[in-house]
Regions:
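Flexible, non-catalytic linker and terminal segments flanking ANL/adenylate-forming cores
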Residues: 1-11
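Conserved pre-ATP/AMP-binding loop-to-beta segment of ANL
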Residues: 23-25, 140-146, 159-187
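A broad, structural micro-motif
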Residues: 10, 39-40, 98, 170, ...
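Structural core segment of the AMP-binding/adenylate-forming
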Residues: 58-59, 82, 86-153
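Surface-exposed loop/turn positions
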Residues: 65, 89, 173-174
Length: 189
């Protein structure tokens, strides 16, 4: 039998604890094509996720709201997911292979209020956004155009300090993530 605490949030209780206890490399991103290697420390991951959580809340997203996340293998994927956890926003991560139709299905099934995508998926979201009545916020990793918001700019506008009044603990029974499972013959379940 597991002893489950009343309040538990992986981003606060594991990530932030690790950042304070022993700040080491949390992620190493290697871009073979560009020949670059970028290390992200636990402290950076913790601080950026706190900034992003506050940015989501500043946009009006609340505990229990959903966000569709389609970001490739890059450090921001982790920052976004941990930020969603800290804000109580339910993340719905998706693979880079998702089509515009796949993204629309996920957004509509969950009533997602935000999409957070890498640049390569902006065109897909633009193609379906009018079909997604709950979608209110479009966030892109990198530079933003039109009514899209830049992840970097959103994070830069927020303080990284963790104030429990701003980012309160949530019950361990809260939904953290929705994972759509699918195969090649049917819609996701």
């Amino acid at each position: 039998q597991l002893d489950i605490p009343d309040y538990f949030n992986f981003a606060f209780d594991v990530l932030d604890a690790r950042a304070h206890a022993a700040d080491k490399d949390a992620l190493i991103a290697i871009d073979l094509a560009a020949g670059t290697r970028k290390a992200v420390r636990y402290s950076e991951l913790s601080a950026t996720s706190a900034r992003f959580a506050k940015a989501l809340m500043a946009l009006g997203l609340q505990r229990g709201d959903a966000a569709c996340v389609v970001i490739g293998r890059q450090p921001e994927w982790h920052m976004v997911l941990f930020g969603c956890m800290k804000a109580g926003v339910i993340s719905m991560p998706g693979t880079n292979l998702l089509t515009a139709k796949d993204i629309a299905y996920r957004v509509n099934q969950a009533g997602a209020k935000a999409v957070i995508v890498s640049r390569q998926h902006v065109e897909k979201v633009e193609a379906i956004r009018s079909e997604c009545p709950t979608l209110q916020h479009l966030i892109v990793i990198g530079a933003a155009d039109g009514d899209w918001l830049s992840f970097d700019a959103l994070c830069a506008a927020q303080d990284a300090a963790h104030d429990p009044a701003e980012l309160p603990p949530f019950p361990s029974t809260d939904t953290m993530m929705i994972d759509f499972k699918s195969d090649t013959t049917a819609l996701p379940k």
